[in-house]
Amino acid sequence: MAASILPFEKPVAELIEKVRELRALAAADPRFEPELAQLEDNTGRLAREIFAGLTPMQKVLLSRHANRPYTLDYIKRLFTDWVELKGDRRFADDCSIVGGLATYHGRSVVVVGHQKGRGAKENVKRNFGMPHPEGYRKAIRLYEMADRFGLPILTFIDTMGAYPGIGAEERGQSEAIGAALAAMARVGVPIVATVIGEGGSGGALALGVANRVLVLEFSCYSVISPEGCAAILWKDGSRADEAAARLKITAPDLLQLGVVDTIVEEPTGGAHQDHDDAAARLDKALWATLTSMDGLGPEELVDDRYRRFRGLGSFVG
């Protein structure tokens, strides 16, 4: 755990650990409760001070945090009756994208999300959250299934990008991403996408053509990583901090630009500090967003999605 603590979050992480220890003591002995309340107040104040001044690149690092909750962590906490569906019916099952059927507040839904691994073995299995074409084709199969049965689609975005390997290109990586974009654009059911970590390039957008897009407070969403941008523009990867600032990839920038619709506040110290609290906060925003579209029919949902994306961007000059 200590190896996963980022330098700028160390003071807060240490206090959070002390809060957990004192909370356990207070549960057994109420005399510790005043001390616990004081420590929680100090922790919250320090976290607000530190996290209010984070640079864009520091927020990118938080979005990649090894302990951050992934799609399956949210599925475990938000849904019941989860049944995972595997394979694209053409080539193989890609474990870097998970999807299936679930019940959400009594409503049947289709869930699709990027899935990273924890530890070397699982990261190899999940390909570090970088999907192959078969992953996107699995997602398409689920989108079309949702459309056929009139089920809302909830997606979770968390990838550095689509896998750039030779095999992936030979099997039609760009075509698969394009087909996923088209499939999302035409389904007549409500779609809510949530950026829960790192949202990189077309590999992320293939799960992001939604009626509404939520973003967690310390997530990012971009056409390219800051390191990649710096390497291309300036031939200097060390300028990633500058690139992160110019790319406007943090949650407040994304909201201002209209790329996302809602920012979901994270627990003190970030979502990785408390998965249960992070899921509870997301649940409130996700349910409110989904139910806000209850009165829209299939054609209205498609038109709403079309107008949302046509409205992005602006002409300058």
UniProtKB/Swiss-Prot annotation:
UniProt keyword ATP-binding, yes or no: yes
High-level lineage: Bacteria, Pseudomonadati, Myxococcota, Polyangia, Polyangiales
Domain CoA carboxyltransferase C-terminal: 31-292
GO CC terms, sorted: acetyl-CoA carboxylase complex
The protein's annotated pathway: Lipid metabolism; malonyl-CoA biosynthesis; malonyl-CoA from acetyl-CoA: step 1/1
Pfam family, one: ACCA
Predominant subcellular localization, coarse grouping: cytoplasm
Reactions accelerated catalytically: N(6)-carboxybiotinyl-L-lysyl-[protein] + acetyl-CoA = N(6)-biotinyl-L-lysyl-[protein] + malonyl-CoA
Record-linked InterPro entries: Acetyl_CoA_COase_a_su, ClpP/crotonase-like_dom_sf, COA_CT_C
Cellular compartment(s): Cytoplasm
Function per UniProt: Component of the acetyl coenzyme A carboxylase (ACC) complex. First, biotin carboxylase catalyzes the carboxylation of biotin on its carrier protein (BCCP) and then the CO(2) group is transferred by the carboxyltransferase to acetyl-CoA to form malonyl-CoA.
Quaternary organization: Acetyl-CoA carboxylase is a heterohexamer composed of biotin carboxyl carrier protein (AccB), biotin carboxylase (AccC) and two subunits each of ACCase subunit alpha (AccA) and ACCase subunit beta (AccD).
Keywords in alphabetical order: ATP-binding, Cytoplasm, Fatty acid biosynthesis, Fatty acid metabolism, Lipid biosynthesis, Lipid metabolism, Nucleotide-binding, Transferase
Gene Ontology process terms (BP): fatty acid biosynthetic process; malonyl-CoA biosynthetic process
EC number: 2.1.3.15
Name recorded for this polypeptide: Acetyl-coenzyme A carboxylase carboxyl transferase subunit alpha
Family to which this protein belongs: Belongs to the AccA family.
GO molecular-function term, one example from the UniProt record: carboxyl- or carbamoyltransferase activity
UniProt gene name: accA
NCBIfam families found in the cross-reference section: accA, AccA_sub, PRK05724.1
